[in-house]
């Protein structure tokens, strides 16, 4: 309706997007439903010839600027493109695009610009989060800087993030950065509460048998629905929709598993939505409250997932003794960065690692360092940033109640098979190989 109105007023509209194009099926063929704009720039269009369709919305906008630059020859736009590179990197990582092909180069070069501190706002945001420029990685974009920038739009107004990025003085940037960090802490607390409420809802509504979880949490802020959906998806390994009460009906976000194309599944039941859109693994929607239970029933009726699809699978690159990883090998892995979705850090595995001692680390003791003895007779240090409570329960179940306490007392003798990553850790000017445990059994 908005574009039609703009057209009626003599305005010309260009739409940029990167989501799947809405479609209807007629006689077994998909017919895309495009808005009546002057141009619709979307690499997901069936007739689009751009060689890489996996770019985010921010990069699509950057491509439009590049096209305008080529057409007009405006030299000022050339400089703008370079300045926008760091924001293209941020948007690529924060929208969970695969870090391959063009995206990998965009993020790699964007990280270099952020490290050099061209933008006062990003430099300040790194400082308040204790991120040294030379340690900056795609992880920090997606899990530290990005959430701080998004928190203001989720809980307040996105203008505050924009003001940070437009700061010209260090003083203004630091003030804005501290405010965003505080807002993100509030967002984290609300997210934890939302996850707890989602767990309660699953139990109360007997959703253990549902293949697709449709969870209605009216009291949850709509801006954090996607984060909660992602956390619940990780825990249960099911497709998840988190619905909340919006200003005009119900709004929600979905997060899916690899075997379930969420956007296609939603298209099959689109009569329940007033608006929807998204990708294979993530989606957003608006709907009427009275249609929540019918939607839950319809999605589950049409779902063809099997029990095997709900079992998380860990795919390692190769089984490798920890003793094989030296400084040279760890340095070569660094050449493969930036790591992230679509370009994960290599995964290795070794059996028979005997856990002898453990030491909890961090301000809240939420991570740990373990001393392990390898089958080759060497001693290695393994760090773990996962769920320590879950690890402790696993040890107590496998080796008897009290095993966790024995391990942290330095008297452990618990053989485990471990999936791990190899990285480099620099502390007080000294760089050494670090083994990061990802899974265990």
Describe these PLM feature segments.
Residues 20-21, 36-49, 60-69:
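A short, charged helix-loop
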Residues 170-178, 182-216, 268-441:
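Mid-to-C-terminal polyanion-binding domains and interfaces
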Residues 51-59, 222-227:
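Short, conserved micro-motifs enriched in small and acidic residues
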Residues 5, 9-10, 15, 23-24, ...:
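Acidic, glycine-enriched active-site microenvironments
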Residues 9-10, 28, 36, 70-297, ...:
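Hydrophobic helix-and-loop "lid/oligomerization" segment in the mid-to-C-terminal part
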Residues 1-33, 40-43, 197, 223, ...:
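N-terminal small/polar loop signature for handling phosphorylated ligands or for N-terminal nucleophile
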Residues 14-18, 41-42, 215-216, 242-243, ...:
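General beta-strand structural signal in soluble alpha/beta enzymes
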């Amino acid at each position: 309706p908005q574009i039609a109105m703009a057209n009626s007023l003599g305005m010309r509209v260009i739409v940029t997007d990167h989501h799947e194009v809405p479609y209807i099926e007629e006689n077994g063929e998909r017919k895309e439903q495009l808005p009546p704009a002057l141009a619709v720039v979307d690499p997901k269009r069936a007739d689009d010839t751009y060689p890489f369709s996996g770019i985010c919305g921010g990069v699509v906008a950057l491509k439009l600027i590049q096209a305008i630059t080529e057409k007009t020859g405006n030299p000022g736009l050339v400089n703008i493109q370079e300045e926008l590179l760091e924001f293209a990197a941020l948007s690529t990582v924060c929208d969970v695009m695969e870090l391959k092909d063009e995206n990998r180069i965009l993020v790699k070069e964007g990280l270099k610009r952020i490290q050099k501190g061209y933008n006062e706002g990003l430099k300040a945001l790194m400082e308040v989060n204790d991120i040294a420029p030379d340690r900056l990685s795609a992880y920090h974009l997606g899990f530290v800087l990005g959430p701080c920038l998004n928190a203001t739009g989720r809980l307040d107004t996105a203008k505050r993030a924009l003001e940070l990025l437009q700061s010209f003085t260090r003083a203004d940037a630091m003030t804005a950065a501290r405010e965003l960090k505080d807002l993100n802490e509030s967002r984290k607390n609300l997210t934890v509460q939302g996850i707890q409420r989602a767990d309660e809802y699953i139990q109360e509504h007997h959703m253990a048998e549902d293949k697709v979880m449709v969870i209605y949490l009216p009291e949850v802020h709509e801006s954090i629905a996607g984060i909660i959906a992602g956390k619940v998806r990780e825990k249960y390994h099911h497709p998840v929709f988190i619905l909340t009460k919006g200003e005009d009906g119900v709004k929600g976000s979905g997060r899916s598993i690899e075997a379930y194309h969420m956007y296609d599944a939603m298209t099959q039941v689109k009569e329940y939505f007033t608006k929807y859109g998204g990708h294979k693994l993530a989606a957003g929607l608006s709907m009427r409250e009275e249609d929540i239970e019918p939607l839950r029933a319809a999605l589950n009726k049409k779902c063809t997932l099997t029990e095997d699809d709900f079992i998380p699978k860990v795919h390692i690159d190769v089984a490798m003794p920890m003793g094989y990883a030296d400084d040279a090998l760890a340095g070569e892995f660094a050449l493969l960065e930036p790591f992230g979705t679509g370009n994960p850090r290599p995964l290795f595995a070794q059996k028979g690692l005997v856990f002898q001692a453990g030491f909890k680390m961090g301000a809240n003791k939420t991570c740990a360092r373990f001393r392990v003895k390898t089958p080759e007779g060497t001693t290695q240090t393994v760090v773990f940033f996962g769920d320590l409570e879950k690890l402790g329960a696993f040890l107590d179940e496998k080796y008897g109640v009290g095993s966790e306490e024995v391990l942290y007392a330095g008297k452990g003798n618990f053989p485990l098979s471990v999936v791990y990553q190899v990285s480099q850790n620099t502390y007080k000017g000294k760089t050494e190989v670090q083994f990061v445990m990802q899974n265990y059994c």
